[in-house]
């Protein structure tokens, strides 16, 4: 998936994008700046997004780590356009690698939807009151033992952040035959 395709899929704007980056193949997407590797796209999540997307609690504004993610090799950073001003001093040298959106969590989810559609493989969705992680693990094990290349959620990443991060692994590993996805249900099924 080219960076230009990512920008289009998330409804982002990159007015100063370095055109050499537009054709860059992007395969890995992260929300933790400490995990950035060369070529990754870093999604900088902020407190308003967490609240707007139903996450309770106090979360760190990862926009403060956007410049360090770029210094660590990230190809680009996706951030809320209204967060730039607060971090303008650190981000100004990097404007050619910034992608602006209204909501970085929603953008991450839109990108996962686009990757899923491009992949087109089979999905086993696991959602129950208790035992999702165990059921996911057993199902993935049986499918893998039958010779199918199987993707499964990392740990118990089953919410509005973890689920998209798992699906986005298909951008780098499209050879999977099936994805076993554990999903915590906080919204009606038609909104997932």
Describe each region flagged by the PLM.
Residues 107-192:
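Phosphate-binding loop of NTP-binding sites
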Residues 1-110:
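N-terminal leader/targeting and accessory segments in enzymes
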